[in-house]
Curated annotation (Swiss-Prot):
This is Large ribosomal subunit protein bL20. HAMAP family: Ribosomal_bL20. Belongs to the bacterial ribosomal protein bL20 family. GO terms for molecular function: rRNA binding; structural constituent of ribosome. Disulfide bonds: none annotated. InterPro entries: Ribosomal_bL20, RIBOSOMAL_L20_CS, Ribosomal_protein_bL20_C. One of its GO terms (biological process) is translation. Pfam families: Ribosomal_L20 (PF00453). GO terms for cellular component: ribonucleoprotein complex; ribosome. Binds directly to 23S ribosomal RNA and is necessary for the in vitro assembly process of the 50S ribosomal subunit. It is not involved in the protein synthesizing functions of that subunit.
Length: 119
């Protein structure tokens, strides 16, 4: 029978993968092969979703701005165009925050947008 000499490195590699797979469901945190596959998938999901998160937040901000704009008699696109014409530079993140936290300030911005659109 051949002599095995890679036990330390093999054990270290397997322990590292199983440690990364801690908390996974079923065999995915117990068996090396399935744990390794799941860890590789997890890295893929993390990479993909770091980019997806940016899209998701932008969608959320736009939905919030649209809801607040419609309460003030404007659509989202008309509000954004009106703000651009009025030279009011405020990003979607801040605008969504204003819409939730300070309705009066958002109404003032909407009125400015309406004035700019009327010109």
């Amino acid at each position: 029978m051949a002599r095995v000499k890679g036990s330390v490195a093999t054990r270290k590699r397997r322990k590292r993968i199983l440690k990364l797979a801690k908390g996974y469901y079923g065999a995915k945190h117990k068996l090396f092969k399935t744990a390794k596959e799941q860890v590789m998938n997890s890295y893929y999901y993390a990479f993909r979703d770091r980019r997806q998160k940016k899209r998701d937040f932008r969608k959320l901000w736009i939905a919030r701005i649209n809801a607040a704009a419609r309460m003030n008699g404007l659509s989202y696109s008309k509000l954004m165009h009106g703000l651009k014409l009025a030279d009011i530079e405020v990003n979607r993140k801040m605008l969504a925050d204003i819409a939730i936290a300070d309705a009066a300030a958002f109404t003032a911005l909407a009125e400015e947008a309406k004035k700019a659109l009327a010109k």
